């Protein structure tokens, strides 16, 4: 069942590193052109427990003060502050939610263990990556591979980086990955 519709089909089995919520020939085609394509460069999605909210709780507070002045992203809706900078405090990053629905955003601060991130070389690259990661294809791939209200970090680490100048026109990325009209409409 996907989007309240029941599907029945057979697909030739192949070894997988993950289990999608639905798997048929169309899904297999989409995944083989994107996250399963080992020839494509992948986003370097990272995690960090440098300032873990619970094991390093003495360094973290909910409110910003003169002592706790370093902004940390805990979840997309929760920001906390630390008394020391995170080892990745500086520089623009794309943050991707792991504990809620798929969402991506840019900031230039640190983080706790509850969110993943991509370090960007500058704000321009961050904006470019953000636009790509918000594309319906990436949202779709994430959503068919999420379990128990959690986004799968291994799937996020398999997201390919297109090597084209993406203008924001969705069809450009579909064309880049050779996604057919039938696959798009699925």
Residues of each region from the PLM?
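C-terminal substrate-recognition regions of SAM-dependent nucleic acid methyltransferases
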Residues: 1-185
């Amino acid at each position: 069942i996907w989007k309240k519709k029941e599907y029945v089909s057979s697909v030739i089995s192949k070894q997988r590193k993950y289990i999608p919520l639905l798997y048929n020939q169309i899904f297999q085609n989409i995944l083989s052109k994107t996250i399963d394509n080992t020839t494509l460069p992948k986003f370097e999605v990272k995690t960090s427990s440098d300032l873990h909210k619970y094991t390093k709780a003495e360094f973290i507070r909910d409110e910003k003060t003169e002592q706790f002045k370093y902004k940390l992203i805990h979840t997309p809706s929760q920001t906390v502050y630390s008394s020391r900078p995170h080892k990745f405090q500086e520089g623009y990053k794309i943050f991707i939610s792991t504990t809620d629905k798929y969402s991506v955003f840019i900031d230039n601060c640190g983080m706790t263990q509850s969110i993943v991130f991509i370090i960007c070389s500058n704000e321009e690259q961050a904006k470019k990556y953000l636009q790509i990661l918000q594309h319906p294809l990436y949202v779709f791939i994430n959503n068919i591979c999420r379990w128990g209200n959690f986004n799968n970090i291994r799937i996020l680490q398999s997201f390919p980086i297109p090597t084209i100048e993406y203008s924001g026109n969705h069809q450009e990325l579909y064309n880049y990955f050779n996604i057919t009209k039938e696959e798009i409409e699925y």
